[in-house]
Every structure is written in C-alpha cells, then in structure tokens.
Curated annotation (Swiss-Prot):
Any single GO CC term annotated in Swiss-Prot or TrEMBL for this entry: ribonucleoprotein complex
Pfam families with a match to the protein in the record: Ribosomal_S6e
Keyword Ribonucleoprotein: yes
Name used for this protein in its record: Small ribosomal subunit protein eS6
Transmembrane intervals: none
Length: 132
C-alpha cells in the first residue's frame, strides 16, 4: 500500500497542515483524480469534505489536471503546471504526470471545501508540557 504526505489547506484560516497517510487512509486516495472530493472521515476529520488540488511524484514531477491517467509523460508546454516561461512565446519539453493518484505519488495537495463541527486547529493542537 502506498504512503502519502498530504498537505491540507484550510481556506477559512489560511493555514496548512501536513498529514502522513498510511494504510487505509492512503488507500482512500489511490485511483482518485485531481479535482475529486473525498470524505474527511478517511483521514479522521468528521464532517469535512476535502478536494484534491494537486500531487507530486517521488522525483518531484508535478501532476497536471488536464492530463488523464497516472503515467508520466514529456509534453511541450507553453504555460501552466510544470512550466513557467521567462520570455514571451517560450515553450519547453517538460516531464509531467497525469491527474490520477497512484502508488508513485508521494505528496498530495488538498483543500477543505466543507468544514466540520470541530476546527482543524483542534485536531493538530499539541498538548502543552506540564511546567515543573
């Protein structure tokens, strides 16, 4: 089973949280595509809805939303994800990955689309150390 690092952004607070997903939590993402919404219960966030906004594979190659499938391809790009031109009209052949989440993906970018009853900050707050 694949392991993922999920970067979850909360647009209400402007904060991002890192989650290490393994086992069944990671299995809920395999086969999904960029733009799909999943239930937050997969990661343990009751009442939340999460939208997949992007991904990166083990070599740092980004996934493009407009490219179907999980495979890596070399495309001639003029703009968008994977290439930012310096000069007008510049094009370059760059490696990009398709929009499907597979076992080769390491990092998944996601955003909260619907919040639950409990704020995300409470899920990630660390207990304070007792002063001695």
């Amino acid at each position: 089973m694949a392991d993922f690092k999920i970067i979850l952004s909360d647009p209400e607070t402007g904060r991002s949280y890192k989650i290490d997903a393994t086992g069944p939590a990671a299995g809920g993402f395999v086969g999904k595509r960029i733009g799909d919404e999943i239930d937050g219960d997969v990661l343990g966030f009751a009442g939340y809805t999460i939208k997949i906004t992007g991904a990166t594979d083990k070599t740092g190659i980004p996934s493009r939303r407009d490219l179907p499938g999980p495979s890596r391809r070399r495309l001639l790009l003029s703009k968008g994800v994977g290439f930012h031109p310096v000069m007008d009209g510049e094009r370059r052949r760059k490696s990009v990955r398709g929009n499907e989440i597979s076992a080769d993906i390491v990092q998944i970018n996601a955003a909260v689309t619907q919040s639950g009853a409990k704020p995300l900050a409470e899920y990630f707050s660390q207990p304070e150390a007792a002063a001695e």
